[in-house]
Amino acid sequence: MAAKEVKFASDARDRMLRGVDTLANAVKVTLGPKGRNVVIEKSFGAPRITKDGVTVAKEIELADKFENMGAQMLREVASKQNDKAGDGTTTATVLAQAIVREGSKAVAAGMNPMDVKRGIDLAVKAVVKDLETHAKKVSANSEIAQVATISANGDEEVGRILAEAMDKVGNEGVITVEEAKSLATELETVEGMQFDRGYLSPYFITNAEKLKVELDDPYILIHEKKLSNLQAMLPLLEAVVQSGKPLLIIAEDVEGEALATLVVNRLRGGLKVAAVKAPGFGDRRKAMLEDIAILTGGNVVSEDLGIKLENVTVNMLGRAKKVVIDKDNTTIVDGVGARTDIDARIAQIRQQIDTTTSDYDREKLQERLAKLAGGVAVIRVGGATEVEVKERKDRVDDALHATRAAVEEGILPGGGIALLRALKALDGLKAANDDQQSGIDIVRRALRAPARQIADNAGEDGAWIVGKLLESSDYNWGFNAATGEYEDLVKAGVIDPAKVVRTALQDAASVAALLITTEALVAELPKEEKAAPMPAMDF
C-alpha cells in the first residue's frame, strides 16, 4: 500500500479552499447574459469555446492533490445541478464558493462546524419555502420561449424553436438535440409512435413518389416470434380481406415463403398488407410490443400469454387511424387503445424510471414514455464552423432542461433577484445558539453572490447594484444586465425556472457544508520515479 500524506484542521481547509477558488473563479466568469467565454484546450483539434459552467468545471484538474479535492467537490455541485435541473450550474458554483469561504472563516474563528452546518441547513429550508411561495406557473408559449432564450444565453431563435417543440410533443415528449449539416437550426417533429424498423420488402410501397407505405385505418397484428409460413393465419387473412381494411404485421421477422406470399397478395391487389420487424431486442422488445398493443387496443400474439396464431381473430388485432412506413422507420398515428390503459402503462413506465439505477435503461424508458405520451421532436443545430455548432448545441441542451424545469415547478424573476428577495425569509429565523446564527448569516451573505457576479460580469459595480436592489420592496424589480436597465424582470422576460434556483441553492449548501465540516485530508504521496538503468555497453 502506498504511503499517504495527511493534512489536518485549518491547513486542510485552506488547501481545499484554494482548489474551490480556482475552479469557481474559472466557472463564474460565464454567469449572466454578459458572461465571458472560457477557451478549453483539446488534445487534438481546435480548442473548445464555451459559456457553459459545467463544461468548464469538468475540464479542471489541479496538480496539488489537496487543492484538487476541493475543486472536485465543487465540480460535484455543478454535476449534480446539471443532472437534476440541466441548468444553473454556474449559479450553484457561485453559491457554493460563497458559503465555503464564509464558513471557513467562521470555523477558523473557533465556531463549532456542526452548529454552523445546522444554521446553514435551517436557512436553506426557509429560502426554499420562500421560493416555492413566489414561483409562478408557466403555461403560455411565450413564457416558455422566454425561459429557453435566457438559458440559451439570449439566443431568441433557440427559444422560439424550443417553445414550438414543447408545444408539439408536450411535456412528456422526447426532444433530442443533434448537430445539423447546414447553417440553419431546424425542428423536425414526429406525431404518434415511431420505431426504427422499415418495410421488409419494397413491394409493399403504396406511395411510389415518396417511397413510403401508407395504410389508412389498418388492422395491426403484433406477433412475438418469426413468421415463416402463413398456414396458421389463413383464416385471419381471409377475415381481414373481407373487411376491406389494410393489415400491418409486426413480427420478429417475416421470412421465406411467408414474405413471398404476402408480396404476391399485395401485388395482385387482393390484400393491402405490409410487414415490419419488431423493434428492440430481448426483454425490451417484449415491452415495446406490449406498448404498441396497448396503444392500438390489440393483443400481443405470444406463447407466454397462451395466445396461438391459429386462434387469433380480427377482434384481437390492434387498430390505428394511419400507419406510415419508410425504409428506416414505422410511425403509428392515433392508435385506438383505451385512454385508461395507456395512462396506466405511462404510470408504470414512470415508476420504472424512478427506480432504475442505470442511465442507459432510464434513457430507453424515457423514449418509451414519450412514444406513448407525446411524440418525438429533433432539433438540428446549425452553424458556420464545428466549434460554433458544438457551443450552440451546449446552449440548446441547457435551454431544453431549463424549459422542462420551468414547466415542472414554475418561474421566478431571473438575474439572481429571487435569491436576493429571499433574504427577508431569514429575518424571523430563530437559531439555537450563536454558532447556528453564524450559519444563517453565511447563507444571508451568499444569497447576494449570484446577482453581484452577474453585474460584475456585465462591467458594472456588483456590490453597489445589489445594495440599490435591496432598497426596493417590489419582488420582480431588478437589474437587467443585458440592457443595463432597472425594470420588472418578469415583464422584461428575464426569468429563471424555480426548480433551477431551488436545486442550485440546495446542492451548493450540501457540498459546502461537507467542506466546512472537513477536519482531515488524506492523499497519496507522489511516487518517486527511479531513473532507468543504463543499457549494457559493448566494448
UniProtKB/Swiss-Prot annotation:
Gene3D superfamilies: GroEL, GroEL-like equatorial domain, TCP-1-like chaperonin intermediate domain
Subcellular localization(s) per the UniProt record: Cytoplasm
Pfam families named among the record's database cross-references: Cpn60_TCP1 (PF00118)
Keywords: ATP-binding, Chaperone, Cytoplasm, Isomerase, Nucleotide-binding
Catalytic activity annotation: ATP + H2O + a folded polypeptide = ADP + phosphate + an unfolded polypeptide
SUPFAM superfamilies hit by this protein: GroEL apical domain-like, GroEL equatorial domain-like, GroEL-intermediate domain like
EC number: 5.6.1.7
Residue ranges crossing the lipid bilayer per the database entry: none
GO annotation (BP), single: protein refolding
HAMAP family xref list: CH60 (MF_00600)
Subunit structure: Forms a cylinder of 14 subunits composed of two heptameric rings stacked back-to-back. Interacts with the co-chaperonin GroES.
Record-stated family: Belongs to the chaperonin (HSP60) family.
Role noted for this protein: Together with its co-chaperonin GroES, plays an essential role in assisting protein folding. The GroEL-GroES system forms a nano-cage that allows encapsulation of the non-native substrate proteins and provides a physical environment optimized to promote and accelerate protein folding.
Name of the featured protein: Chaperonin GroEL 2
The organism of origin for this protein: Sphingopyxis alaskensis (strain DSM 13593 / LMG 18877 / RB2256) (Sphingomonas alaskensis)
Lineage: Bacteria, Pseudomonadati, Pseudomonadota, Alphaproteobacteria, Sphingomonadales
